[in-house]
Each structure stands twice: as C-alpha cells, then as structure tokens.
C-alpha cells in the first residue's frame, strides 16, 4: 500500500504539490531525514508507521502479545526520525543579529478584470500602485521595516519588459519609489519572453534596481493554466478570466557580496 501511494503521488499530477511528509515540518528533529530521501521518504515512513498501527489494531483481539511486534514497528519510524534529527540538526548559533522586519502590504483591491472594464487599464494600475505606495510609505517610515512585500499580482502587467511607453514610465516610477524607500521590494507582476507571459515575482533593490524575477513553476489549473486539450475558443468564452501563463523554471539565483549586495 505504501509503495502504491508513493507511485501514484509520483506519476499522477495533483492540483497542489503537497505530500504527507510536509506535516513533519513543524518538528525540527523529525524533518531532518528529508536530506536522505526527500519529502517522499518522510511520507513513506509515515505510511509504514500507520500500516503497522493498523495491523496492531486488527490483531488486538488476539491479546497483548500479538500487538507487540506491529506496535514496535509502528513506533520505530518516528523514533528513528527523532534520533537521526538529534544527530544532524544544526545548532542554532547565539547571535545578537536583529531579526528581519518585513512589511506585508495587502490593499484589499480585488477583481482587477471588473475594475479594468469599468475604469480602464491605466486607471486601474494607477489606483493599485498609488494605494501600495501610500501603505508602503507608512510601513517604511512609521513601522521601520527592512523590506516591503506587495502580495499577489500588485503590478498587473509586465515589469522590466514594458509593452508601451506608459508601461516603461510606470516601471521607472516603481524603481524610483524603491530608491526613495531605501529598502528592497518584492512584488507580484508578469514576465515576458518569446514563449509567452509568466506569473512572476520581481525582486527590486534600491541600489541595483531589478535584481531578478521568479517565474511561478506550478500554475493553478483552470485559473492560471489550461491544458491544451481543453483550451479553445469555447472554453475561453465560457471562462474568460482564465489565465494563459506559461510555467516558469523556478527561483533565480544571485551572487551576493560580503555586505549583502547582489
């Protein structure tokens, strides 16, 4: 049963890339074994432990002796995880470093498509950005944050690859806001290349501007991505809000200097 479960998780696409092993994340010791077999290995151990406990329950009418072996096997997996984690878990260094304070900006502006139809694309972008500018100013000047995070797709057009002169001006405006704030910004936007558009997150610093873009690699089915066999004019007419983004390759990497600059 455990092998079948793991095989199905590996071969069948799921809406979300979750697995039972993720449930061990809150335990600093039990999650360490992921360096040996990944999250799938943790899932396998959890399933084996549950199979052993189920076998013990099935044998309980036969008395205590019949329970001992499956119970021992069921408890062995979590004990092994704890023991291994105790040996390899990193010791938290004693440091006086200040924790990173991040300002999460949530404007509660929703349904961009409806707003675009009612106000026009440029007016909507203007409203979204002005709202985030004001909230970011409060976060930087009054809350003294070290970085600012604009949640969701705050900038609903391509950043760094403007499609128009107005888009290029908005890009420069955002860069100017980041320079004035003197802290890094991360925000949702779109990216563009010859293959199409990507749902992305932009990393912008005061010193260097656009540091890089993360292209989302796991798109949400029927919202951000439609399988080719299902896509078509009829589908788009019935669900016009469905996205057409491409799947990205994951997180970018940047070299940093000794003072933290990329």
Task: Go through each PLM region and give its residues.
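Enzyme catalytic cores with a strong preference for nitrogen-chemistry domains
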Residues: 1-262
């Amino acid at each position: 049963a455990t092998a079948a479960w793991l095989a199905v998780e590996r071969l069948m696409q799921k809406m979300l890339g979750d697995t039972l092993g993720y449930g061990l994340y809150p335990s600093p010791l039990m999650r360490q074994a992921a360096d040996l077999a990944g999250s799938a290995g943790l899932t396998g151990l959890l399933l084996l432990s549950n199979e052993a406990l189920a076998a013990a329950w099935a044998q309980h009418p036969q008395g205590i002796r019949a329970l001992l072996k499956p119970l021992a096997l069921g408890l062995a997996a979590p004990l092994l995880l704890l023991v291994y984690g105790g040996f390899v878990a990193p010791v938290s260094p004693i440091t006086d470093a200040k924790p990173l304070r991040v300002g999460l900006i949530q404007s509660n502006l929703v349904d961009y498509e409806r707003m675009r139809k009612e106000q026009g694309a440029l007016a909507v972008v203007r409203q979204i950005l002005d709202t985030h500018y004001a909230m970011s100013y409060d976060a930087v000047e009054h809350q003294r944050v070290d970085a600012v995070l604009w949640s969701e797709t705050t900038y609903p057009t391509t950043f760094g690859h403007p499609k128009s002169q107005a888009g290029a001006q908005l890009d420069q405006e955002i860069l100017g806001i980041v320079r004035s704030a003197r802290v890094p910004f991360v925000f949702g936007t779109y990216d563009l290349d010859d293959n199409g558009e990507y749902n992305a997150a932009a990393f912008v610093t005061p010193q260097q501007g656009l540091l890089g873009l993360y292209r989302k690699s796991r798109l949400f089915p029927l919202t951000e991505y439609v399988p080719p066999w299902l896509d078509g004019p009829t589908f788009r007419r019935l669900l016009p809000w469905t996205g057409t983004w491409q799947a990205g390759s994951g997180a970018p990497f940047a070299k940093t200097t000794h003072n933290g600059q990329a």
